[in-house]
């Protein structure tokens, strides 16, 4: 047996083990607030590195996009398949004020809608709201059987598909171009779909008519006052107003 040093045993510590710092100790927690158009305002919490030197925490938060289920925002499980995107536009204190950034369907809902023996009709429309938001709305609809129909299939002719698509485009243009973004977000989930269904019934009966996606293409110049109004707040100094209302000047009747 060869006599020698066991390298593994004789190996000593070259240096002390580095002390690892918890990365969360350098972070702050901010609350994410949804616009007042939704029933539930508290979306959740988000983490960001504290302001150090030239790196401002507010700059890191602005522009963040959160995807939230519409069921959580409206306290209604019927909207569970809709996902709303909210973008942080302003940070006030520990609150992140968000604005609507888009809407989408869950993939499982979309897959469940597509079936055999029916025609899928899709349309997309680019519209501008009254407050200068440029949006692209994607509509989806499916044909259904007429009352007392014996035939298994419900295929629409090309001329009927074109007529339905034209009707969808007209309705979306009319509803979106005369409203603000906040008003439009209330209509998108159900109202526009029902309006399309009712208007196209004479061409071909439809089912599962939805605005499946909303894409924000362009936003107007940032306006803090408009964002605060959307969140039910005011950019004016409330303290000054309260003092004016409470204070009553005493008028002396006699000197």
Curated annotation (Swiss-Prot):
**UniProt GO BP:** translation
Q: Where are the disulfide bridges? A: none
**Compositional bias (Basic and acidic residues) spans?**
19-28
Pfam families reported for this sequence: Ribosomal_S3Ae
* Location of the protein in the cell: Cytoplasm
- The chain residues annotated with the modification N-acetylalanine are 2
Write out the ranges of the annotated region (Disordered).
1-28
Cellular component aspect of the GO annotation? cytosolic small ribosomal subunit
Q: Which InterPro entries match?
A: Ribosomal_eS1, Ribosomal_eS1_CS, Ribosomal_eS1_euk
- Keyword line: Acetylation, Cytoplasm, Ribonucleoprotein, Ribosomal protein
GO molecular function terms attached to this record:
structural constituent of ribosome
Q: Basic residues composition bias: which ranges?
A: 1-18
Q: What's the family? A: Belongs to the eukaryotic ribosomal protein eS1 family.
Classification via HAMAP family:
Ribosomal_eS1_euk
Assembly information from the UniProt record: Component of the small ribosomal subunit. Mature ribosomes consist of a small (40S) and a large (60S) subunit. The 40S subunit contains about 33 different proteins and 1 molecule of RNA (18S). The 60S subunit contains about 49 different proteins and 3 molecules of RNA (25S, 5.8S and 5S).
The record's section on PANTHER family has:
40S RIBOSOMAL PROTEIN S3A
* Name the record gives this protein: Small ribosomal subunit protein eS1
Organism expressing this protein natively: Ajellomyces capsulatus (strain H143)
